[in-house]
Amino acid sequence: MADLRDEKGNPIQLTDQHGNPVQLTDEYGNPVHITGVATTGATTGHHDHGVGGASHGGVGSTGLGGVAGAAGLAGATAAAATHGGSHGGTGTHGVGPTGVGAAHGGTGTTTGLGTGTGTTGQTHGMGPTGIGGTHGVGSTGIGGAHGGTGVLGQTHGMGPTGTGAAHGGLGTGQSGLGSSYATHGGLGTGIGTGSAPASAGSHSHAPEKKTALGEQLHRSNSSSSSSEDDGQGGRRKKGFTTKIKEKLGGGKHKKDEHTTVATTKTTTAAHPGGAAVAVEHHEHEKKSMLDKIKDKLPGHHSPTSH
């Protein structure tokens, strides 16, 4: 049983956090009667040991009263001199404003989060310092530094020097990145040099001069008993029968003709005496062979027998 009043004498009803009336008992479950006046700003109540004596101090407000589960205003009310009855010392349990109120402010948490986030953000500056300006791959890495293909293209000018228009030099220049394409205009020069072998086959032969004496010599040599005129400007070999007929029919006349030609040839030679002897000796051997053949044939006699 609690008979509590405020400073103006109004009764104060003890309830729990849900507004339900609270029955005060001691540690053995016996009802406890509390009387007192609540005043503002008092932290220690009027200690009247009352019925329970000093041994039952602090059970009411601490265990089941408004202090238990008190938040804010309820804690402040319970911390006043409400427990000035027989259960003294209850007022010291002022848990309200100190435990739950502003004392538990998030200064530490707020400061910690704010400071940590700021420092981390500035340190990890991935923007312009990390990737932006440092990794300038564009102009320095691939652009002008790798423009060496054009120089190689100019060095390999195979067109005008090597073979001519067949190579032309233009294909070699295209191996660059496009910067040296116009420089390799060696096509015109290659055509001029390459046309040098065009004079092949223009060999001229001096006309062969023939004298009347040379023609006579050619005819005399070609009119031997081994060949005859084929009617087309050439010579063909005589048959054995044709040779015998010539020797039998007009052999004497032909032999005289051969002797005359041989004599003419020896007269125009550089050494007439020696050449004439050699030819006449050759004709003499031919006559001996023919005379022998005629002697073997019936009805004919050797020219030497006449």
Curated annotation (Swiss-Prot):
Superkingdom of this protein's organism: Eukaryota
Region ranges (Disordered): 1-57, 80-171, 188-306
GO cellular component, one term: cytosol
UniProt feature, compositional bias: Gly residues: 85-119, 127-151, 159-171
Comp. bias intervals (Low complexity): 32-44, 194-204, 260-278
Pfam families membership: Dehydrin
Polar residues bias locations: 12-23
Biased composition (Basic and acidic residues): 205-218, 243-259, 279-298
GO biological process terms held by the UniProt record: cold acclimation; response to abscisic acid; response to water deprivation
Family: Belongs to the plant dehydrin family.
Protein name: Embryogenic cell protein 40
Lineage: Eukaryota, Viridiplantae, Streptophyta, Embryophyta, Tracheophyta
